[in-house]
């Protein structure tokens, strides 16, 4: 066992769970719940570092770049999950937010042994995407030293991309490799070394923050409404209708009519209702202001 493993919080034993195998089920659950409560406070201390990643992503995506997550195991699966949720939630192109996982698609469903140990393979898989200076590449590694992930961020840096990382140990190897490190220590796991637990929760919450705050920065919300939702199923069509009603105060019938004329696009429908425009006029108005509803409907920004 090397010194890095000895120092890693994610590999440490949790004194509170040393008798785990002797506890009644309810006590096991209480213990896990208590430990999970440590996660938000641990994240809170790193909000400025997370904000720096978001600001870089907003800048890069605004210039046509991509947000690329890369991880192995649980970390990789969470990155793929977050990326996959962006198109239906924000109508993004599937290439705008991308998730890479060591071992490829198969690794989403079952472990691919040894995949995470190949740094060269990580670099090769990133290079397939031809990263550039407008891209932001975020390495996800609970330990902060997964070779495949380190290989990815090194390749990203060589290509001139902005690099970031999210890990759950202090003074992690990957932190010294990236421009924007995020280190969140939520303490050792209830089940020693099982980083699918608190470390996984840390990464899920941070990814939620990165993607959501980035999309807010790109103008894909109006207030707290997901006005760029893609109405690709009945639930989302109903949501789009509710969003138009909430944003404008219009009736259900008026929202349905506006959405029909807008081709299901909630942003267009909102501008139509608020400004009394046709769908064509509303689309043109949104195009003038980069698709930001707040600016589109603000009288101070309307052309005289």
Curated annotation (Swiss-Prot):
One of its GO terms (biological process) is peptidoglycan turnover. SUPFAM superfamilies: SIS domain. Its EC number is 4.2.1.126. PROSITE patterns: GCKR, SIS. The active site is at residues 85, 116. It catalyses: N-acetyl-D-muramate 6-phosphate + H2O = N-acetyl-D-glucosamine 6-phosphate + (R)-lactate. Homodimer. Belongs to the GCKR-like family. MurNAc-6-P etherase subfamily. Specifically catalyzes the cleavage of the D-lactyl ether substituent of MurNAc 6-phosphate, producing GlcNAc 6-phosphate and D-lactate. A lyase-type mechanism (elimination/hydration) is suggested for the cleavage of the lactyl ether bond of MurNAc 6-phosphate, with the formation of an alpha,beta-unsaturated aldehyde intermediate with (E)-stereochemistry, followed by the syn addition of water to give product. This is N-acetylmuramic acid 6-phosphate etherase. It comes from Cutibacterium acnes (strain DSM 16379 / KPA171202). The gene is murQ.
């Amino acid at each position: 066992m090397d010194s890095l493993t000895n120092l890693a919080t994610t590999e440490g034993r949790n004194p509170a769970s040393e008798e785990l195998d002797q506890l009644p089920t309810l006590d096991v659950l209480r213990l896990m719940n208590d430990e999970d409560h440590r996660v938000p406070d641990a994240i809170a201390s790193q909000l400025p570092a997370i904000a720096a990643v978001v600001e870089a992503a907003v800048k890069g995506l605004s210039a046509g770049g991509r947000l690329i997550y890369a991880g192995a195991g649980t970390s990789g699966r969470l990155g793929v999950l977050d990326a996959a949720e962006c198109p239906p939630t924000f109508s993004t192109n599937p290439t705008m937010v991308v998730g890479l996982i060591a071992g490829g698609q198969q690794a989403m469903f079952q472990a691919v042994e040894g995949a995470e140990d190949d740094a060269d393979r990580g670099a090769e898989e990133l290079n397939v995407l031809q990263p550039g200076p407008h891209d932001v590449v975020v390495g996800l590694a609970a330990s902060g030293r997964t070779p495949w992930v380190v290989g990815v961020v090194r390749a990203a840096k060589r290509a001139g991309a902005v690099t970031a990382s999210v890990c759950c140990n202090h003074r992690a190897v990957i932190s010294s490799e990236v421009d924007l490190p995020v280190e969140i220590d939520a303490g050792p796991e209830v089940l020693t070394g099982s980083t699918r637990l608190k470390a996984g929760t840390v990464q899920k919450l941070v990814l939620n923050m990165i993607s959501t705050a980035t999309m807010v920065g790109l103008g894909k919300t109006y207030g707290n409404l997901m006005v760029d939702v893609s109405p690709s199923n009945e639930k989302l069509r109903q949501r789009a209708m509710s969003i138009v009603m909430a944003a404008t105060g219009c009736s259900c019938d008026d929202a349905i009519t506006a959405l029909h004329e807008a081709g299901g696009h909630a942003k267009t429908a909102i501008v139509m209702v608020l400004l009394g425009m046709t769908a064509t006029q509303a689309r043109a108005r949104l195009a003038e202001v980069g698709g930001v509803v707040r600016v589109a409907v603000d009288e101070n920004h309307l052309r005289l």
